């Protein structure tokens, strides 16, 4: 079963779900602009993925938020790497959750190429941060873009 299409027509989680139900082994090649990623299935189970410097489930989550680009499924191509140990259902649920989260964020942040910076505030203002938020704040340096920071923290 050769399958190909556009991510603007079908989301990657939906396409993976369709192919995985058939129990196929092969690879999804996913591309947009100058980025290319791969998601490997063995007997219908997602076992490995890579895009850029990301591997495993983080690579799947990154590609799942792509709304533009193309995909093709090449049956029979295998990998010896097993970097994903989640069930397809859990992997796709997390991908869908991140996609929903991304849709909300993308309305508030017009571009990942923006460089965040601190503004001066009255020192009497008290700010309370969670450990997760504190890690993020420590990466803001007036030089790196939102995308750079997300990549550094593996939050993309």
PLM regions and their residue ranges:
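Acidic, Ser/Thr/Pro-enriched low-complexity segments and adjacent helix/loop capping patches
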Residues: 1-156
